[in-house]
Amino acid sequence: MDLLNTLFQSAPWGPLRIGLHAVFLLAAAYMLTQVLGLRAVVALKHLPKPRAGFGMAAVLVLLGFGAVLVHQATWQLFGTTRPAFVAFMQLHDRRQFNPAHWIQRGRILDATGTVLAETRAVQTSQGPAAQRYYPFGPDFAHVVGYADPRFGASGIEAAANVQLNGGKPESWQDWGELGRQLLTQTKRPKGNDVTLTLDAALQRLAMERLGERAGAVVVLRPQDGALRVLASTPSFDPNQVDADMFLRADPRARLLNRATAGLYPPGSTFKVVIAADALDRGFSGGIQCPADGWTTSGRYRKIRDHEYYEARRAGRTWRGHGRIGLDTGLAQSSNVFFAQLGVYLGHDAFRATTERFLFNSRITIGEGDSGRQFMRTGRIPRIASSDRYGLAQASIGQGKVLATPAQMALIAAAVANDGIAVRPRLIASEQPAAVGRFMQPGTAQRLRRILRRAVAEGTGRGIETPGLAIAGKTGTAENPFGAPHSWFIGFAPADRPRLAFAVLVEHGGYGSAAAAPIARDLLLLARELGHLP
């Protein structure tokens, strides 16, 4: 046994290893000559063709197996030109420790320099090691993610892994030096910091206001896409990652980032999309909106306005809106108006509009050398041309229409930015980039006036705050599994927007009751922090 160990380990190119490679190469050469000889025999037309049976299959299998062996032995073959490296590797057992514990990963910071993730020195059974620490626990878990030697990494920890570990070595010598530092533990490699666009104070307030309720908050700058808030509840503590998080079913889905991946019916907030399409197409007429509602056929339930149900619960009779135009229809969030408007515009217009607004796609919001972080926009299946009622439902944000809070925030930002949607971004060093034009500048300007009116005297008037000039659209999305979801999207200030937002509260009821107050509180703090004039 000692002799075998000596032959295998004492030198990078021992006699036994040379013999094994020689036998393998001779066997491969013999098999190759047999195959070539067989091809030559087949080429003789006057002789019967030999049958390629088990023998040929065996040769192919052996050749494939040999290729695998060659691949596995490449480090030994290349090692002949790097004897110092081979000798070094033979002297160190890499199984004794995990190199990931030894790297001093860089910090993850918010836009103001507040530390969101850092590496701290700890003592383990194998000696000193580095452990990732997240000062705010669950507040940034879905964005920052986690980095754990046992379970890998997620979020920015995964997307920016190379930068956080010190950057990508530029040469084989750099790789070798990094390996020596890790294995000998003579010097702890230090990573680079990554700065995000988030504001820790705003993010923490969003998480606090959502509380135990499931939901999401997205706040961004319309002009450059810088995300100030990307909050999702319920969350998890990245300081306490364990196997149960991934193995046990969680009815509350704490690992799901509802802001970027949660799909919800957008309800009345989707009327902004239909209104933008109508204005781009030059619509300027009025639509009769009866109090008792409207439907495409007697076979289907009537689509009604929320005032109808409020009056019915109070024992009153509602007179209806009568004939109204788009401005009043959007400010008062009339389902009857937009259901008819969507059917009037038609299936082709609806499909073209949702494609222009980038539904059914993904957008990169954070990109590093080792990965990307995405946001889903939504999911809207094709509506059959014969399904007029399905189109009517979709036009008021119900039916088969689903959207993420991040997508609805992007739509609000496009209205605030004269129709141009700028890619939401998490990493401060990334350059702003437009993802498309959602609507014409004139359409965006008119929508800003209408959405300001919606807060001043329409469905969002409950959060009207002096000095903020909030413009927005409430949404109450029907939910087959319980109480309606509460939405509020918009921007502020209305005349010169600096921040756009979307707030979703699952099972929150009316948008003006649950989601809108959260947006108002965030905007008040944003003004104190200097994000708003």
What are these language model-derived features?
Residues M1-M245, R254, L263, S268, ...:
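Periplasmic/cell-envelope proteins involved in peptidoglycan metabolism and beta-lactam response
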